[in-house]
Every structure is written in C-alpha cells, then in structure tokens.
C-alpha cells in the first residue's frame, strides 16, 4: 500500500486515520493492528465514485483474501462510515474475517448497503472472534435478488465467536427473496456462539427475522438478550428460526414482534 504505518512496541501497526484503516487489506490482512484514537469517517461518503454515485469505504477482507490478523480498537470509535455496495457480498467495516480477531471497537452511525453477509462491523466471521465491540447505525438492503445473512453487528457467524458485544441498528432487508436478518447476527451456524451480547435494534425482513439472531442453526446463544422491534415472516423477538440442535440458554427478548407472511 502507499500508506505508511508506525508500529507500537509490540510490533502492531497503528491506525490513526481512515486512510490507514482502508489500507489494512493492502498492507497485510494477516497482520495485527491497533486503533490509537477515534476516527471520523464522514469523508467515505464521497469515496470510489464512478459517476453513478459513491460506493464509499471498501470492506477490509473478502472471501478470497479474508482478514486473518487481529484488530484492537482499544475502546475507540469509528464514526460515520459509509458503504454503498448493493451487489456485493461480505460487506462491513471488515468484509470477511477468518480465524482473526476484532475487539474493543465501536462503529457509530454507520450507513451500509450490500447483498449477502452484511454487518455493521463484520460481514462474515469464519472461525474468528468479535469481542467487546458494538455497532450503531443503518443497514438497508433492498434488492430483487436473493439477499441473506444481514445483522446489526455481524452478517454471518460461521463457527466463530461473538462475545460481550452489542448493536443498536436499524436493519432493513426488503425484497421477496430476502432471508436471515438479525439485530445482532443474521445467521449463527456451524457451532458459532453468541455470548453475553445484546441488540436493541429495529429489525425488518421478509423471512427468518430475529431481534438478536435471524437463524440459529447448529449453534449456540448464551446469556444474551434483545429488546428491539421485529417485523417479518418467521419472526422472533430473540431468534427468527432454530434448527439442527441449536441451543439458547439464559437469554430473553422483550421487544415487540409482528409476524407477517410474504405477500401480506
């Protein structure tokens, strides 16, 4: 990358601005990074404009080159980040995280559009960890194609861990083919775990819509809760649909739930 980084005494790359955040993928998605201060990413609203509108920030890590390192936010916040990639998969500040770790970071007032595996912080975790982190803002997916796995914090948790984290997002997934939307996690699957986490999100979707998790499949939710408003088919205050021995322990929901069937 053409962006320079300093390293701290532990050899971690220091991220001090939004350009350094954007260039993590080019600098090395297998490296370790630390956020040294809050970042206002308002400028991303004008990034990557091809004449038909700005696509904004390019998610860190994708399916072919996922983020595999560690990112420690040190309790700092990234605010006003903008992503408009309505045909894309693996969309979030981090698009795809494989066996990597994202911790101690807040994403405030994010604005994201995408199609599949979309989250306020991470699009998809594959065996990795998101801990002590949160996201707030707007995730709005509208497509005539099939869109799935959309969450306020994490789109899909595939065998990974989400712990001590929360989301307060407006998550809207419209379109007749759209499924799996959750206030915190869209789909929790393959022994994924969600622990000590909560969502106060407003969640709207077509099918398999949950205040915390849209679909909990062969996975676990522990000591977590949701208080948001949920609207959709297969709608649940905590979980939209449970399958294949998925478990929920010491968790609850108190939000308003409106179930509706496609076509209503």
Segments (PLM) and residue ranges:
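Surface-exposed repetitive/solenoidal architectures
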Residues: 1-264
